């Protein structure tokens, strides 16, 4: 797979670092914003550290990578990515390894420029950015184990294709090649030697043209004799560390030719760069004791200030005659698809457009005078960004914000417990399971927190017996009935022996002793009883039963006078409310 995000972030970060102006606070802010994103794009999804021997899924479009030693372990991503679950599809990605090396070289370059001093002086974001720089530089130190200085150049990962073939004479004496020193002059239309994708011709180069202040020479101690028979038709390898390795020494030129004719051409094309990455077997020829003595005052141009101490370099050459010109270790991929589906871990702020190679390095022209250093008074910095291994970034939140969110969460939970204190246990468990969700990846300080509540399911039936926390069937008695208090009829009442006298139409049932005719009619309509026979008890004969069939209720009630004392015992019905 092609790491589009990491490549685009590397190009943007390199352009900002190389064009950094101490008097421009906006550039400082952009660098502080892009460096954490670049570091996050090269993080292992399992351990969270910088990738070591990175492997990536072959048939996936997600930007998730793991170390070779972390293969098979669980990724720290929530939710998990469905595209890279199968570790059998993971293979070694060489372009990712190159990007990791470029990240280390970029960190080393920053540590030896004025940008590092500005980062240390910035109180708001110094700790996080310094941690990222130390992560890249210390990782490179452990890999290379240099002995001369703490931040040295690591060029062992930068093989350079060469057309010259070394001889097999191991007894060649060390001789400085001062005559073959190449000084590059940059015209007004050329931007640090990279104007277009197709490279530049040799007409733009000059021999022994000084730097903006004075001429700089590089002494190269060679351990072998180089054949120079066909150097008129071929070009020696040129190691431009600013464009390839982004190291701190400005321009290091390893020249093995006695002269260069103006008719030759120096081409830097994307195809040759990609083809150079495929050459695995390269003959390594070491050039030790490379001592750069460059001194200049331009901070963002092709020449940088360096100390006079000697640094150990390991420059490698290959004997592949098919490749000519420069070879960049930072591989430039093909034009990436911008309309791809973005993953959930990427926010809108992370969408960085890929930049062409011609705009990586922008510096002043040769004829321009050295810029006047302006002391910067104000520094604008963003909120410190903490890297998260699941593909996203979260800004660091201060302790006060964390405490406020904790107390807010407790208050919400306490309020929800009070509101559901009189519900059934089943609904109470459902409400406890619904917790407030605070977004972690896109949470910015100052933005209101959104609390998600689940709407409780509406209950069927009346509230009788369900009003308390522990429902009971013996609660609906007389005035304790909530439906009776609200003058409503009970519906699907769970109470045993519900005696609510209100009907569905809002009218109240009448007592039997008030209007007996209407009370019996209401009873028949409410209970659905067909009044065909009523047992009447007589005071004298308790077993006598009068069957009233076919006659209306009024004739039955009118059959006895009001003086009859057995009328109270005749109708065996009670209405207790």
Swiss-Prot record:
Catalytic activity entry: S-ubiquitinyl-[E2 ubiquitin-conjugating enzyme]-L-cysteine + [acceptor protein]-L-lysine = [E2 ubiquitin-conjugating enzyme]-L-cysteine + N(6)-ubiquitinyl-[acceptor protein]-L-lysine
Glycyl lysine isopeptide (Lys-Gly) (interchain with G-Cter in SUMO2) cross-link, renumbered residues: 375
Region (Disordered): 405-427
GO molecular function: histone H2B ubiquitin ligase activity; promoter-enhancer loop anchoring activity; ubiquitin protein ligase activity; zinc ion binding
EC number of this enzyme: 2.3.2.27
Sequence positions bearing Phosphoserine: 447
Record key words, sorted: Autism spectrum disorder, Chromatin regulator, Chromosome, Disease variant, DNA damage, Intellectual disability, Isopeptide bond, Metal-binding, Nucleus, Phosphoprotein, Transferase, Ubl conjugation, Ubl conjugation pathway, Zinc, Zinc-finger
Ranges where the record places region Sufficient for interaction with MSL1: 1-116
Annotated InterPro entries: MSL2, Msl2-CXC, Msl2_Znf-RING, Tesmin/TSO1-like_CXC, Znf_RING, Znf_RING/FYVE/PHD
Positions annotated to bind Zn(2+) 1: 44, 47, 67, 70
Binding site for Zn(2+) 4: 462, 483, 490, 493
Composition-biased stretches (Basic residues): 407-423
Pathology linked to this chain's protein: Karayol-Borroto-Haghshenas neurodevelopmental syndrome: An autosomal dominant neurodevelopmental disorder characterized by global developmental delay, intellectual disability, psychiatric manifestations including autism spectrum disorder and attention deficit, dysmorphic features, and motor issues such as coordination problems, feeding difficulties, and gait disturbance.
Assembly and binders: Component of a multisubunit histone acetyltransferase complex (MSL) at least composed of the KAT8/MOF/MYST1, MSL1/hampin, MSL2 and MSL3. Forms a MSL heterotetrameric core with MSL1.
Protein name as it appears in the record: E3 ubiquitin-protein ligase MSL2
């Amino acid at each position: 797979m092609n790491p589009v995000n990491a490549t685009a972030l590397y190009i943007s970060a390199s352009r900002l670092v190389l064009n950094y102006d101490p008097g421009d606070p906006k550039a400082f802010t952009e660098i502080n914003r892009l460096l954490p994103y670049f570091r996050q794009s090269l993080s292992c999804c399992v351990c969270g550290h910088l990738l070591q021997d990175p492997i990536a899924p072959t048939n996936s479009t997600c930007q998730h990578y793991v170390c070779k030693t972390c293969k098979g372990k669980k990724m720290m991503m929530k939710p998990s990515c469905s595209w890279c679950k199968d570790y059998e599809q993971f293979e070694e990605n060489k372009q990712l390894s190159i990007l990791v090396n470029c990240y280390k070289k970029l960190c080393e370059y920053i540590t030896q420029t004025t940008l590092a001093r500005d980062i240390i002086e910035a109180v708001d974001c110094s700790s996080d950015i310094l941690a990222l720089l130390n992560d890249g530089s210390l990782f490179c130190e452990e890999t290379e184990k240099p002995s001369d200085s703490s931040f040295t150049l690591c060029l062992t990962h930068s093989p350079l294709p060469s057309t010259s073939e070394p001889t097999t004479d191991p007894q060649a004496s060390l001789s400085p090649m001062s005559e073959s020193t190449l000084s590059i002059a940059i015209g007004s239309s050329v931007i640090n030697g990279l104007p277009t994708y197709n490279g530049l011709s040799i007409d733009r180069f000059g021999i022994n043209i000084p730097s903006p202040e004075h001429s700089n020479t590089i002494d190269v101690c060679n351990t072998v004799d180089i054949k120079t028979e066909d150097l008129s038709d071929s070009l020696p390898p040129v190691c431009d560390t600013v464009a390839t390795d982004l190291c701190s020494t400005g321009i290091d030129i390893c020249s093995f030719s006695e002269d260069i004719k103006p008719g030759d051409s120096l081409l830097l094309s994307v195809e040759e760069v990609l083809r150079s990455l495929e050459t695995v077997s390269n003959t390594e020829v070491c050039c030790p004791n490379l001592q750069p003595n460059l001194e200049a005052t331009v901070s963002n141009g092709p020449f940088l200030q360096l100390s006079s101490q000697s640094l150990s370099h390991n420059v490698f050459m290959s004997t592949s005659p098919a490749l000519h010109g420069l070879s960049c270790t930072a591989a430039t991929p093909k034009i990436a698809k911008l309309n791809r589906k973005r993953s959930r871990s990427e926010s809108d702020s992370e969408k960085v457009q890929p930049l062409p190679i011609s705009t990586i390095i922008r510096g002043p022209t040769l004829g321009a005078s050295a810029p006047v250093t302006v002391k910067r008074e104000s520094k604008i910095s963003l909120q410190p960004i903490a890297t998260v291994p699941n593909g996203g970034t979260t800004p660091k939140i201060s302790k006060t914000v964390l405490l406020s969110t904790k107390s807010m969460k407790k208050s919400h939970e306490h309020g929800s417990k009070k509101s559901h204190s009189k519900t059934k246990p089943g609904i109470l468990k459902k409400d406890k399971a619904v917790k407030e969700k605070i977004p972690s990846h896109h949470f910015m300080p100052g933005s209101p927190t959104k609390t998600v509540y689940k709407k409780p399911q509406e209950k069927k039936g009346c509230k009788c017996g369900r009003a308390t926390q522990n429902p009971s069937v013996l609660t609906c008695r007389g005035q304790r009935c909530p439906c009776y208090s609200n003058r409503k009829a009970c519906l699907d009442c769970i109470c045993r022996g519900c005696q609510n006298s209100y009907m569905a139409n809002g009218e109240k049932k009448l007592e039997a002793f008030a209007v007996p005719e209407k009370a019996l009619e209401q009873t028949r309509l409410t209970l659905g009883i067909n009044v065909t026979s009523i047992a009447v008890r007589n005071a004298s004969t308790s077993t006598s039963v009068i069957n009233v069939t076919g006659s209306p209720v009024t004739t039955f009630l009118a059959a006895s006078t009001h003086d009859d004392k057995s009328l109270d015992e005749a109708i065996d019905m009670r209405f207790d409310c």
